[in-house]
């Protein structure tokens, strides 16, 4: 846009086809030679690297615009094709038009009344802002039904499309063996008691003279169309064969040139902007050099872009075509060269068309042509526009650090010195800015660059840092290192929801990994088995302010998906709070102080009592209560099934475990967040994590093989339960083989047998689990983890200690394998438990080779299912994001798209954020408390609050209302 020119608002954008003349007009040069560079290494004129198409080499000037490399965006050229070729992108549309228009007069095969009706449909569709392609499809479908042109009366033939770019006109003609077909159909058929048809009878049925029938039967006369159809009807024979006439691109172009413009308008095509003959190319645009740059290899040779390779092929075949045609070569050679030219133009457009061999390098690698540059994950749209590589980002492995706040992230010092934030120098921060510059790029906190007021950027080095520091004045900008407290954005892929990218505060730390508090793992779906995460350093104050207010971790404690907390205590934290509060253990003063020393609590509450020795003690409930807000009152059923009672910030009853403080909807965290705010919730979660870690270290908590080993007596009871199940299964099999097994309603006998065997073996596993569970104490580490909800379940413990159980594929016992048996270790048609995937061993005792094989079969199904679901859900999510990305909630509360169409009159139909709604019927939000908290944060005095609430001040003098006021005051 030139200076002083006012910007204009775009009313609409319409797409159309380009006229060959437009290709020529925008072209900087005609390309006629396939050579690129001369012997001296300079681009050849009218070649594919002509300087008029743009320049990529430093020092050269573009001969079209005069700009140097970097300033010139490049210019198109063109190739004059020796013969028309079909644009493969329009092959389906070409087929539709060939089938819907007359082969003689090229008019649309619809009557004038039908055309008017479709024009009205188009106007109505456009006024409703709907897609007009459905109307066009309906018009072509209607036109295809006509076998005669309603305008010129010409007979119409079907058009067959042989992908990608070959078209045939299919005509039904009289078969060469028509007389034999008639004679064969007239013969008697003994199987169907058919006496056959004599020539005299055929003549009577068809009203054809008997002499003519005899001439037809002898092959002396070829019947006309009316006679042929009459004979076919009489004897039920087909006397025709398909005659396929290939339509050359030049024929199709001539056909389309004759289509009237008003007929195109009935199909929704603007004939001024898009003529159908332009889909058959006579001129091929050549992309600018900047779109297909060549590179220089280490040995000095140039390597050309894939598009340039393809254009070389097109020019060479084009030249051969012209030379052979001018030399009068046979038609067969001309058609072969034409097909070859069509192939090269097709693969230049798209090198992944099914049924067409891809163009390849000498190495065998397929060329990456125009379509491949645009589509797919690595293409222009998804790879370069929607997502791209950015500066000011870092990526490394993550490690856990429970000493950090959930708002913080540990950043390696090496990253902190490489990443910078822009600091605008003023009077207040001048000395600090100079100190950063003086420290240089190596010292931390230092600076890497400074920007002068005139916009010039100067790199800070060890040599010039002292001098630069003295020159820094207000108005300069310093690109300083990241320091503690800086706000950055942290992300883990795949980014499936909003909380996959959140803002953290920097804590610069040694070593090379990002450090993260474990309570922040659930929203990122992160673990520490090698996961990597991305960090982005924000570059301006607006971005940093928005991130701090909207994206900080403490603002994401409640999930917008289900309205409950997604951040909370996990795994070891839950085991720690369980040990601290289960059975309400007692602690002496030293132990109680040690438990609370990493929290903000600086003094112990009053002791709960004294023991037999007269020493004071504090309880687990009492210590946990120190973390709760003073006015918190709750009562609900907890993880372990007992009732949790909290009154005025004191835990009176219950055990604190997953449902109380864990992630994904715990009562205490959810309530504190909604009633007391995100800051108080963040403090609570941090302190619960610290207290839980101290508790788990106090009690001691470890797990090993011995913790899952059952006693000899328990092992014998488990073996008895499994043997009893085996005996029951054998009885079922014998009953089935004797034919005495009754089928269940709606089931076959085979299905009934399988169901009963599965039920029997399922009960055996449950019995083994019950025995194993009885064998373990309540303080067993695996039992603690299962009961508290920290990790795993009693089923996992059952399989570790008792019996793994039946392995299933697609919900059934394992039946696949060899013929009539699952493995070669079993007899054919063996229906026993062992032969169909029952694993009687536990993980502790170890699986036999046969059991291991069956177990792997069951596990594979889970892996495959996970992979399939991941790819499907990822594709669906991307489709939804693309479809919904333009929707936006406006200031009037409506949800609208970019064309201002109202999608919802109120966001979510109720105008309510899930974060603000209580999802638990048992726990109501204390609305008054929330209102008081908001008012206290907004107003400094009670007078301001009263003005806001429009509460009238009580009278201050004892007038007529004085007595009434005194009474009210006494109350």
From Swiss-Prot:
E.C. numbers: 2.7.7.6
What SMART domains does the record tag this protein with?
RPOLA_N
UniProt modification remark: The N-terminus is blocked.
Location of this chain's protein in the cell: Cytoplasm
Any GO MF annotation of the entry? DNA-directed RNA polymerase activity
Q: Where is this region: Disordered?
A: 185-204, 951-971
Kindly give the InterPro entries that the UniProt entry links to this protein. DNA-dir_RpoC_beta_prime (IPR045867), RNA_pol_asu (IPR000722), RNA_pol_N (IPR006592), RNA_pol_Rpb1_1 (IPR007080), RNA_pol_Rpb1_3 (IPR007066), RNA_pol_Rpb1_3_sf (IPR042102), RNA_pol_Rpb1_4 (IPR007083), RNA_pol_Rpb1_5 (IPR007081)
* Residues bound to Zn(2+) 2: 102, 105, 149, 152
Q: Where would you say this protein principally sits, based on its record?
A: cytoplasm
Give me the Gene Ontology terms describing cellular component.
Answer: cytoplasm; DNA-directed RNA polymerase complex
Provide the catalytic activity annotation. RNA(n) + a ribonucleoside 5'-triphosphate = RNA(n+1) + diphosphate
List of residues that carry Blocked amino end (Met): 1
* Cofactor names: Mg(2+); Zn(2+)
Q: Name one GO biological process term.
A: DNA-templated transcription
Record Pfam families: RNA_pol_Rpb1_1 (PF04997), RNA_pol_Rpb1_2 (PF00623), RNA_pol_Rpb1_3 (PF04983), RNA_pol_Rpb1_4 (PF05000), RNA_pol_Rpb1_5 (PF04998)
- Domain of life, per the record? Archaea
Write out the residues that bind Zn(2+) 1: 62, 65, 72, 75
Keyword terms, alphabetized? Cytoplasm, DNA-binding, DNA-directed RNA polymerase, Magnesium, Metal-binding, Nucleotidyltransferase, Transcription, Transferase, Zinc
Q: How is the cofactor bound?
A: Binds at least 2 Zn(2+) per subunit.
* Annotated binding of Mg(2+), by residue: 527, 529, 531
User: Which family does the entry's similarity section mention?
Assistant: Belongs to the RNA polymerase beta' chain family.
Output the HAMAP family linked to this UniProt entry: RNApol_arch_Rpo1N
Question: What is known about its subunit structure?
Answer: Part of the RNA polymerase complex.
> What is the role of the protein in this entry?
DNA-dependent RNA polymerase (RNAP) catalyzes the transcription of DNA into RNA using the four ribonucleoside triphosphates as substrates. Forms the clamp head domain.
Quote the protein name from its UniProt record.
DNA-directed RNA polymerase subunit Rpo1N
The upper taxonomy is: Archaea, Methanobacteriati, Methanobacteriota, Stenosarchaea group, Halobacteria
Q: Which gene encodes it?
A: rpo1N
């Amino acid at each position: 846009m030139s200076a002083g020119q006012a910007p204009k608002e775009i009313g609409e954008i319409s797409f159309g086809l380009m006229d060959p003349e437009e290709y020529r007009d925008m072209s900087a040069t005609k390309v006629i030679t396939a050579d690129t560079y001369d012997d001296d290494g300079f681009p050849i004129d009218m070649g594919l690297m002509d300087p008029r198409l743009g320049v990529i080499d430093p020092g050269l000037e573009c001969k079209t615009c005069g700009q140097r490399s970097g300033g010139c965006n490049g210019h198109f050229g063109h190739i004059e094709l020796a013969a028309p070729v079909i644009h493969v992108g329009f092959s389906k549309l070409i087929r539709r038009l060939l089938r819907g228009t007359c082969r003689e007069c090229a008019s649309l095969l619809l009557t004038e009344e039908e055309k008017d009706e479709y024009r009205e449909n188009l106007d109505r569709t456009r006024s409703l802002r709907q897609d007009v392609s459905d109307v066009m499809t309906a018009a072509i479908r209607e036109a295809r039904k006509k076998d005669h042109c309603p305008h010129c009366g010409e007979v119409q033939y079907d058009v067959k499309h042989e992908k990608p770019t070959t078209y045939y006109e299919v005509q039904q003609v009289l078969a060469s063996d028509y007389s034999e077909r008639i004679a064969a159909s007239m013969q008697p058929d003994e199987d169907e008691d058919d006496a056959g048809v004599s020539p005299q009878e055929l003549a009577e049925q068809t009203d054809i003279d008997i002499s003519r029938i005899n001439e037809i039967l002898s092959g002396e006369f070829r019947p006309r169309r009316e006679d042929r159809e009459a004979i076919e009807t009489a004897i039920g024979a087909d006397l025709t064969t398909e005659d396929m006439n290939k339509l050359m691109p030049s024929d199709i172009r001539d056909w389309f040139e004759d289509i009237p413009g008003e007929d195109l308008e009935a199909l929704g095509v603007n004939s001024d902007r898009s003529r159908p003959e332009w889909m058959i190319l006579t001129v091929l645009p050549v992309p600018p050099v900047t779109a297909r740059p060549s590179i220089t290899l280490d040995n000095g040779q140039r390597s050309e872009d894939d598009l340039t390779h393809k254009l070389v092929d097109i020019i060479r075949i084009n030249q051969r075509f012209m030379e052979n045609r001018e030399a009068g070569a046979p038609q067969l050679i001309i058609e072969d060269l034409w097909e070859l030219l069509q192939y090269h133009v097709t693969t230049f457009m798209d090198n992944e068309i099914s049924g067409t061999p891809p163009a390849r390098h000498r190495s065998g690698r397929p060329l990456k042509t125009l379509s491949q540059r645009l589509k797919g994950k690595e293409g222009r749209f998804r790879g370069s526009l929607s997502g791209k590589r950015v500066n000011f980002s870092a990526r490394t492995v993550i490690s856990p650090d429970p000493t950090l706040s959930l708002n913080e992230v540990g950043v390696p010092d090496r990253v902190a010195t490489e990443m910078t934030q822009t600091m605008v120098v003023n009077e207040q921060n001048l000395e600090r800015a100079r100190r950063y510059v003086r420290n240089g790029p190596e010292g931390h906190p230092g600076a890497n660059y400074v920007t002068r007021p005139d916009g010039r950027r100067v790199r800070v080095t060890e040599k010039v840092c002292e001098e630069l520091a003295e020159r820094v004045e207000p108005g300069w900008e310093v690109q300083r290192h990241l320091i503690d407290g800086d706000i950055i954005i942290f992300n883990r892929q795949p980014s499936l929801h909003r909380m996959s990218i959140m803002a953290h505060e920097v804590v610069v730390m040694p070593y090379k990994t990002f450090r993260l508090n474990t309570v922040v793992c659930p929203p990122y779906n992160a673990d520490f088995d090698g996961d990597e995460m991305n960090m982005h350093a924000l570059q301006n104050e607006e971005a940093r302010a928005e991130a701090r207010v909207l994206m900080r971790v403490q603002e994401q404690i409640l999930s917008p998906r289900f309205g409950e907390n997604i951040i909370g205590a996990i795994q070891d934290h839950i085991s720690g709070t369980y040990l601290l509060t289960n059975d309400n253990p007692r602690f002496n003063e030293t132990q109680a102080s040690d438990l609370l020393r990493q929290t903000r609590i600086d003094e112990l509450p009053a002791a709960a009592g004294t023991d037999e020795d007269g020493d004071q003690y504090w309880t687990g409930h009492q210590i946990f209560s120190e973390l709760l807000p003073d006015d918190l009152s709750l009562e609900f059923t907890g993880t372990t099934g007992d009732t949790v009672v909290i009154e005025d910030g004191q835990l009176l009853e219950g055990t604190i475990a997953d449902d109380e403080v864990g992630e994904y909807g715990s009562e205490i965290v959810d309530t504190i967040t909604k009633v007391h705010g995100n800051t108080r919730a963040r403090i609570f979660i941090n302190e619960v994590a610290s207290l839980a870690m101290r508790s788990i270290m106090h009690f001691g908590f470890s797990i090993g093989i011995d913790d899952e080993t059952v006693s000899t007596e328990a092992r014998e009871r488990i073996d008895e339960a499994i043997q009893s199940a085996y005996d029951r299964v054998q009885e079922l099999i014998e009953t089935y083989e004797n034919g005495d097994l009754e089928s269940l309603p709606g089931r076959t006998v085979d299905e009934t047998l399988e169901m009963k065997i599965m039920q029997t073996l399922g009960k055996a596993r449950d019995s083994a689990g019950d025995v194993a569970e009885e064998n373990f104490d309540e303080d067993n580490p695996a039992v603690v983890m299962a009961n508290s909800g920290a990790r795993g379940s009693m089923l996992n413990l059952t399989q570790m200690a008792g019996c793994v159980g039946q392995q299933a594929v697609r919900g059934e016992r394992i039946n696949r394998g060899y013929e009539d048996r699952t493995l070669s270790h079993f007899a054919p048609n063996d229906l026993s438990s062992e032969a169909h995937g029952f694993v009687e061993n536990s993980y502790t005792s170890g699986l036999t080779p046969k059991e291991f094989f069956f177990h792997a079969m069951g596990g594979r199904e889970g892996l495959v299912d996970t992979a399939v679901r991941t790819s499907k859900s990822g594709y669906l999510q991307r489709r939804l994001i693309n479809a919904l990305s333009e929707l936006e909630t406006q200031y009037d509360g409506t949800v609208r798209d970019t064309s201002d169409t109202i999608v919802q009159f109120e966001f979510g139909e109720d105008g309510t954020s899930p974060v603000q709604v209580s999802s638990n019927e048992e726990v109501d939000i204390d609305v008054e408390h929330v209102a008081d908290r908001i008012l206290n944060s907004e107003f400094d005095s009670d007078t301001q609050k009263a003005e806001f609430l429009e509460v009238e001040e009580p009278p201050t003098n004892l007038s007529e209302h004085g007595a009434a006021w005194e009474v009210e005051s006494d109350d």
